[in-house]
């Protein structure tokens, strides 16, 4: 096989199209999108994206809702902390 690309990585499929800065943004997004994440239920590094905003753990078969390109978003973290604070106030 021929030697693969070193600099551009996953966005080599776009060639010289769309401009360098847009390809850098897409590269960052696609790396986080196609990576694996740690499951908060079983602890395995087996969570993969199955579709937009839906993440599935291949270890314990749990299905999680998350962001479109990353498993957790800043808005989701804010909501979780607010829920935790409200639960502490009720108890």
UniProtKB/Swiss-Prot annotation:
Zn finger intervals (C4-type): 39-60
Keyword line: Metal-binding, Ribonucleoprotein, Ribosomal protein, Zinc, Zinc-finger
InterPro entries: Ribosomal_eL37/eL43, Ribosomal_eL43, Ribosomal_protein_eL43, Ribosomal_zn-bd
Family statement drawn from the similarity comment of this UniProt entry: Belongs to the eukaryotic ribosomal protein eL43 family.
Pfam families: Ribosomal_L37ae
Protein name as catalogued: Large ribosomal subunit protein eL43
Keyword field contains Nucleus: no
């Amino acid at each position: 096989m021929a030697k693969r690309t070193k600099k551009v990585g996953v966005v080599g499929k776009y060639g010289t199209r769309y401009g360098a800065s847009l390809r850098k943004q897409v590269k960052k997004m696609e790396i986080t999108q196609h990576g694996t994440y740690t499951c908060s239920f079983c602890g395995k590094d087996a969570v993969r994206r199955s579709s937009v905003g839906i993440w599935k753990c291949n270890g314990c078969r749990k299905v999680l809702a998350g962001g479109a390109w990353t498993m957790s978003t800043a808005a989701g973290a804010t909501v979780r902390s607010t829920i935790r604070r409200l639960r502490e106030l009720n108890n």
